Amino acid sequence: MSKTQVVHYEKWQSFAGDLLVFPLGEKPEFSGDMKEIANIYNKLEATGDFSGKDGEAVLLYSSQLKKSICGAERILLLGLGKGDKDSDLQRDLLRQTGGLVAQKAAEIKATEVLVVIPTLAGRKSADTLEPLVEGVLLGDYRFLKYMSKKDAPAPYRGLKVLALSFAGAFDKALERISERAQLAADCGCAARDMAHEPGNGWTPKHFSRYAKKLAKSHSLVCTVLGKKKMKKMGMGGLLGVSQGSKESPQLVVLEYSPENPRKTVLMVGKGLTFDSGGVSLKPGAGMEEMKYDMCGGAAVICAMKAVAEEKPDVRVIAIVPATDNMAGGGALKPGDIISHYGGISSEVVNTDAEGRLILADALAYGVEKYCPDYVLDLATLTGAAIIALGHHHTALVSNSDHLVELATRAGAKAGEPVWRLPLTEEYRKQIKSEVADIKNVGGRPAGTITAAAYLEKFIGDTPWLHFDIAGTAWNFTEKKYIPKGPSGTGTRTLIEFIRSLG
């Protein structure tokens, strides 16, 4: 649950907190109770200090004003631009404005902030409210768990109260939209928390503990398969990757099952709690960031909280194959051959291409057991995705044009854009092995696509989406609502995807 309390104010003039915020577009229209703000805007526009352009910000102190207009110590005017962008772009600009609110609050160490939600031409209040609230809460995120309390001065710990007021009337529908935005932001921040945890603070068993706790508090069904059960079921990928580690692998399953669901959706997330590369050891520089190799697992688990609270008419199953990839004495070696759940054999050419090995078992198991209508998997799978798309788009591979359309809409709405890559027979040939059914590396060319081709072997004919979030899960493209570090990417896209179905 968010540390920030979100409340609603009938009249912004009665707010006596640290910071009062007015997001304003160019040439805004002011309602009757905004006369004083209109006067301030007109003076600032005349002097060239503020005109409402996108990204503009002016901080005023109430004590400097000739006439007191509220009890807040400071007033912040933020520019929204002309508001002529397409709906998804405008939505993300509003989200970024919310992030800027959080940044400005941090600069002055404000803990109580009120945002007056504007009425923009051609947009409903709900369309403005949701991304603004998301942006503030996502932008206010910080991970301070391991900061010593002996430090002086104490670090700023973010907003305690986010108050909302409206230029127009507030009603129950807007309250629900506000709660919806809070939930999506909370889930995204929970995924960031998991990714921030070091390898010694988040092990495979932490995934299972978190899932069990979530199941208990939200009436979900949780099942955890351990090493003994995996051996019996022939999950050679997950078992093989875990061989070099002292941590026991876990296959964590969460189920939400309404009566008479319209669809069944299987979500699988890579839960590699630390990736050294195994025997195919990674370079030392930057290896500390390999704690983030479980961001796919974090996304699917945290999205289940939103599913459980919103109760869509869709059955949703989340599976996280969790382990770490270490180079201990029993570790997989290049050239080893493993057998996946269902019997497909694989030649392990490179032990640092381990994500597809653990996902394959989880996908095969989930498809067989739950017979889903749709399968989605998320993984920080390939460096090739970063080479292809940088840190601005998540790579998407699919066997279904319809699902790609749904995923593209969901990603755009969440501010987490995706870009589809092809998957044709030429790429499938790259993973053919001379000694097994397939091999886990298809050479340097098209690494993101050949990794997806590997996973495709385990989903049968089920419509399927593969999200390679390697480039977007950490230090995602510069956005004001995404602080440095893990972004939580994928969590809100999954939430929007399920919302579109249910």
UniProtKB/Swiss-Prot annotation:
Its EC number is 3.4.11.1, 3.4.11.10. It comes from Desulfotalea psychrophila (strain LSv54 / DSM 12343). HAMAP family: Cytosol_peptidase_M17. It is found in: Cytoplasm. SUPFAM superfamilies: Macro domain-like, Zn-dependent exopeptidases. Binds 2 manganese ions per subunit. Mn(2+) 1 binds at D275, D352, E354. GO terms for biological process: proteolysis. Its cofactor is Mn(2+). NCBIfam families: PRK00913.1-2, PRK00913.1-4, PRK00913.3-5. The keyword Transferase does not apply. It comes from the Bacteria. One of its GO terms (molecular function) is metalloaminopeptidase activity. It is an enzyme of class 3 (hydrolase). It catalyses: Release of an N-terminal amino acid, Xaa-|-Yaa-, in which Xaa is preferably Leu, but may be other amino acids including Pro although not Arg or Lys, and Yaa may be Pro. Amino acid amides and methyl esters are also readily hydrolyzed, but rates on arylamides are exceedingly low; Release of an N-terminal amino acid, preferentially leucine, but not glutamic or aspartic acids. This is Probable cytosol aminopeptidase. Presumably involved in the processing and regular turnover of intracellular proteins. Catalyzes the removal of unsubstituted N-terminal amino acids from various peptides. InterPro entries: Leucine_aapep/pepB (IPR011356), Macro_dom-like (IPR043472), Peptidase_M17_C (IPR000819), Peptidase_M17_leu_NH2_pept (IPR023042), Peptidase_M17_N (IPR008283). The lineage of its organism: Bacteria, Pseudomonadati, Thermodesulfobacteriota, Desulfobulbia, Desulfobulbales. Keywords: Aminopeptidase, Cytoplasm, Hydrolase, Manganese, Metal-binding, Protease. One of its GO terms (cellular component) is cytoplasm. Transmembrane segments: none annotated. Belongs to the peptidase M17 family.
